[in-house]
Regions:
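Conserved ABC transporter NBD signature motif
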Residues: 61-69
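Catalytic Walker B motif of ABC-type/P-loop ATPase nucleotide-binding domains
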Residues: 164-167
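Conserved ABC ATPase signature
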Residues: 139-143, 147-149
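Helix-to-loop junction immediately C-terminal to a conserved catalytic motif
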Residues: 53
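Short coil-to-helix segment of the ABC ATPase nucleotide-binding domain corresponding to the Q-loop/switch region
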Residues: 99-107
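Conserved signature/switch motifs of ABC ATPase nucleotide-binding domains
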Residues: 83, 138-141, 159, 192
């Protein structure tokens, strides 16, 4: 594993019955970079994310995080790894509706045995930079779609993970809000020196990333390509009311 690599999949294969989802995929994620995994539905892109993130085990192949092999770990250790070294942003946020925003963000810390008061203090520090000031006590149902995704971004980053995984993070948002959400996701992740892996079918989303990898029928079709990004704004919290 390269000294500049944070996460590496080697020869990853995964099948579901007769359906081959991954057919021997190699992918390296470097420190601090954003990588888009693109492909149509059923191409294997989400399966690749799940194998890299330790959500599922590949049938064969290896996954290494910071030089350590993780695909052979038991579920308990992989669960702890997902909670501490990885962050996740999903299409619909997956926030707990009964908890205020600040406790949704604090939850990964509390699951890692940080006291509730300390976890909430750490969680609150994310709200201003992400344009969520004053929304700490709101429940998910009181937030717009874009605001809820910003809360999910804060939750993904609160443990200072090595890698953030985002699966169709703008799929439920309108174009303008999705653009703003991707800008914040990329900028906040890079600011915290984490790598970002984004699964998407949308070239506009992929355009925010440093590299694009295309997956089809379980194979990577081409080598990683540089993304074409335009119009990136600076400052996480611009247009924060969406």
């Amino acid at each position: 594993m390269s000294s500049h690599s944070v996460l590496e999949g080697r020869g990853l294969k995964k099948s579901f019955g007769p359906t081959v989802a991954l057919a021997g995929v190699d992918l390296t994620i470097h420190r601090g970079e954003a990588v888009a995994i693109m492909g149509p539905s059923g191409s294997g892109k989400s399966t690749l994310l799940h194998c890299l993130a330790g959500i599922m085990r590949p049938d064969s192949g290896e996954v290494h995080l910071l030089g350590d092999r993780i695909d052979t770990l038991g579920e308990r250790r992989r669960s702890a790894l997902r909670r501490t070294r990885f962050g996740f942003v999903f299409q619909f946020g997956q926030l707990l509706p009964e908890l205020p925003a600040e406790e949704n963000v604090a939850l990964p810390l509390m699951l890692g045995d940080v006291s509730r008061p300390q976890a909430v203090r750490q969680a609150r520090s994310w709200f201003g930079p992400l344009g969520l000031g004053g929304m700490e006590g709101r429940r998910p149902g009181e937030l717009s779609g874009g605001q809820a995704q910003r809360v999910a971004i804060a939750r993904a980053l609160v443990t200072r993970p090595a890698v953030v995984f985002a699966d169709e993070p703008t799929g439920a948002l309108d174009q303008a809000t999705g653009h703003d959400t991707m800008r914040i996701l990329v900028e906040a992740t890079k600011h915290n020196e984490a790598s970002l892996v984004v699964v998407t079918h949308d070239p506009h989303v992929a355009g925010w990333c440093d590299r694009v990898v295309e997956v089809r029928d379980g194979f990577i079709l081409t080598g990683p390509l540089p993304a074409q990004t335009s119009g990136q704004a600076s400052g996480w919290a611009q247009e924060g009311s969406r």
